C-alpha cells in the first residue's frame, strides 16, 4: 500500500487510539496500534510505520513507551481494517 492511503486510514481517527487489523502480502495478519513517535513524519514519508502489536497494547497504553513498537514497511501491507469487535462499536 502507498503511504497516502495508509495515512488517510489511520489519521482518520485510529492513530494511537484503536487497534487495526493489518493484513500483509507475505506475513501473517496482526492486530496493532499505529503510534505517533517523534520521527512519525519522517517514517511516514518513507512508507514505514511504527506499530505496537496486540501482545503489547495494554503495556503501551499505560507507559506510551515506543520501544514496545516495531517498524513495518507499508509496501508489505495488503489491507487495513477495523477488527470485528471494534467495527461493531463504531
Language model: regions and residue ranges:
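Conserved RNA-binding domains used in RNP assembly and mRNA/RNA metabolism
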Residues: 1-90
